[in-house]
Each structure stands twice: as structure tokens, then as C-alpha cells.
Amino acid sequence: MRTIRFNNNRHISSSPLLRTEGGREASVSNTSGDKIPKGKFSFLLLFFLLFLGSCSSDFLDNKPTDAVDSGLVPVPSNAERIFNGAWYNLFEYGTTYANIGYRALMCLDDMMADDVVSRPMYGFNSSYQFNDVVMPSDGRTTFAWYLMYKTIDNCNTAISIQATGDDDTPEFRHAQGQALAVRAFCYLHLAQHYQFTYLKDKNALCVPLYTEPTNPNTKPKGKATLEEIYTQIINDLNRAKGLLDGYVRPNDKSKYKPNTDVVNGLLARTYLLTGQWDEAAKAALEAAKGYTLMTDAKNYMGFNDISNTEWIWGHPQSVSQSDASYNFYYLDVVEPDSYNSFMADPHFKDTFTEGDIRLELFQWMREGYLGYRKFRIRSDQTGDIVIMRSAEMYLIAAESLARKGQLGEAVKPLNTLRNARGLADYDLTGKKQEQVIDEILMERRRELWGEGFGITDVLRTQRPVVRVALTEDEAAKEYDCWQQNGTYKKYHPEGHWFTSFPDGTKFVPNSIYYLYSIPEKETNANTNLK
């Protein structure tokens, strides 16, 4: 493993009353599970100027300077740099080795759901046991909250800039459109994690809604309803779509910058969550255009390259800027120095059909765990991060059409994906609507394993987490398990070992254990949240 260095790690509260600063310039060894030193809490003024000055306009090509440029002001010529700073925060900000950027939250969300078995190692064991983000005092709870609101505030700064005359350039409009898309992305995350699904109760209170940059005089807000938040998300995305019209990303390394395909993908996710089936299917199919599906299992093995033809949106990594790559140490089951935390439920493998190219990814390994060799860190210890790809869009279109009752149309995008994975068309003969929807949802689980959709799909579909322990007969079997020195050793299989909530009760739909909590330091600072 490598030593990583966290730069400018400042917590930014959604409440202007609370500003905490910790971990700046903390160099640590990654051979232990110790938390990065946090330093003292302090009030920050003009925090977006302080943070954003560290991000150069050639972000993701060269390592950002550690210098703080207090002269970076919110003017049109700085809009792109401000967006880049927001993006850098979203994916590179970290508080511990297991909390580095948005990819850590994606790991958390899958560990809380059905199909990942936690190998008891450093990382996400507490997530598997529903024992971190549900607790207001937990460090990961704090990390998740501030990661989103700091990014939102930085986006608000870029969005608030006014330009006229010669300052109103295409580059400025594109930067604002990208900031709007990322703000919508952040609020979509918050809406899915801090309240039950929109289709359960759109009037339920969720989180504060800030659309202007905060300052020490900003009045803390209370919770907005889900309907208010989703209305803002859709408005932001429609504005972004207009501003990004005609924008073309120059190369794959620029895939972190939203274009209209990304915006359509975010609209598809949003419409799916709000039950707008026609709009969801239309936006999803539009987003998928031009992103060719993989047809070879080798393209899955690694899943670390932003040039993958399926990837619509991703976060590239380089040797000089790669803190986010540390998340691969939890997902990679082959790398000898990895934690190998994410293993597959053996029952999950049983849902795959012979001929499916994804079956090649499974391998019994380690102490009897079933590895799923989807994610590999590269030899230079980096790995690009996928955020959105065309396979997800085909699944959104299929599910939306099926929920509308158009089963014949629904299986068309489903079969497009199945055929690419080596499978025949889904047989619709005699199938009822519920059966088709269930098959599409199962295909989502097979296709998107490890990509951060686990617990949000549980919440969206209002079902319980399902974890089934191995039976006596299943556990008595022996398998030749691959060892990281290249040899094989016989072990009994390992499956789910945590199959109820921490209080001993059974998994149920719409449980508070599936939701993130607001940090207690936030509710203490902003009494409007109580």
C-alpha cells in the first residue's frame, strides 16, 4: 500500500454557525487503521475562497498546489476553477482512510444492502452492521454530511456569478452548467439518504436547501420537504442542460465534467425516483446514446479506466492526484496488499445464468469467501471511479416502462443489456407486470454490484434488506480457494454473518437503519433542524 496525504481537509457545515477545520496537511501511514489527526475546530470566514484557491484550472492534469490563493474571487473568469474546486472536494476530500470522497459513500451504500458480504477487515464493517451513519455522533456521519454541503456551497458560489458582455463566454456558461449539475447530484444524494422515498411521502421533511453561497451572516435553515428538494433538482438540471448545449468534452480525462449526457442521466435517476416513468425512460435512453455496452468479461476485470466505452461520467485519477483511489483497497479482492473487504454473497452468484460473461468474475478465495473480481487497482496504485454508465440507463428505461405497464417496450432495453452480457432475450411469455419489474430489479443488482446503488434501491423500492445465511449443508461444502500467492487451499464457504438489525430485530422496509443521520454537531449548531 501507499502513504496518502490529505490536503485542505476542512469541514464546511450547512449551518453558517458552525465551521470546523481538521486534518490539514496531515501525512499519515496507511498501514494502520488510525484516524487522521483532526486538529482544532475553528470558525472560517470566506471558506470558499480559502479552499478553492488550492485548485488550479488544469485540475486532474496536475496535482493541485497546496498554496491558498486568497485572491480567487467569484468572477466569471474564475468560474471554471471554482467548479473544479467543488469537484475536487467531492471526490478527494478525506478524514480517514475509509472516508475518502464520494466513492467512500458508494462503498458504504453497497455494504449496507443485500449482495456484499463483509470480510472482517478495516474499512466498512460497521456499515455492514448498520452501526455508523445511523448514529449522529459517528465520524462517518459527520464526513458524509459535510462532504455534500461543502460541495454544494462551492457550487453555489459558481452559480451565483453574474456575467455580461465579454465576460459571458461559452466557458463561463459551461462552468455554471456543470456546477448546477453537480449541485443537483448532491441534493439527489441527500434526498435519497436522509429521508424515505419520495413516492412514500413527498411532503416528508428531509434536509436544508441552500441555493446561495453562505457566509457568517447567513441564517441557518430548517429542513425542506422532499418535494421542494426534487423541484430544485429538476430545475437545476434543466438549467444545466441549456447552459451545456453544444459543450463537447475534449477527451476521456474530461469525463468528470458533466455534459448533456450526464444531465440526462441525472434527470433519468430523478424521474425514476419521483415516478415520472415516461420522462425517466426518455432521458435514460437519450443519455445512453453513443456509450457502447461491454461484451467481454475482460472489460469488467478492473473497472478502473475512464475510457471504458460504457462510462458516461467518472472521476479520473493520476499518480500525482489519487487519494480517491484508496477506495480500491476495499473493493479489490486480488491485490495482495488490499483489505479485500468486499466479498460477494454466494446466493448472489446463484442469480446469474450460464453464458453470462459476468460469471467469470466470481472466484472462491481467501478463507472461503466468494470474490467478485470486478474492481482492480492499477499497478501504479490508481483507479478511475465510475459514476454513471449506459448499462444503468438501459435498466432505468426498462424499469420505467415496466412500471408504466408497457412490458413489450420494457424488455427492449433490458434485452439490449442482456445480449451484451452473453444472454438470450428475456422470455416475456406469461409474465405479469410484477414479475418483469422484479427481473429488472434483479438485473440492476447483478449489473451494478459495487457501484453504490445498494441501499438506495432498497429505500426506493420500499423493500427490506435481504441477507440469507448459508444453510448447514451449504456451509459444510468445501471449495478450492485461490490464495494470493497463487496456490489453492480448501475452505468451507463464508456467507452473510450479520442478518438482522443491531437490536436483533428482522430487516423490514423503510427502517431508519437504512438512513443517514444528521450529525449531532450540526443539530447543536442549527436548532432549526431539531
What residues fall within each predicted segment?
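Membrane-proximal, proline-rich intrinsically disordered regions
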Residues: 55-106, 352, 426, 430, ...
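Short, surface-exposed recognition loops and adjoining beta-strand edges that mediate ligand/DNA contacts
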Residues: 67-72, 97-118, 195-203, 207, ...
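Glycine-biased, low-complexity coil/linker segments
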Residues: 18-22, 34, 39
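Conserved, well-structured interaction surfaces
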Residues: 121-194, 224, 242-245, 380-385, ...
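Hydrophobic-face positions in mid-chain alpha helices that act as interaction patches
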Residues: 279-391, 423-424, 437-439, 447, ...
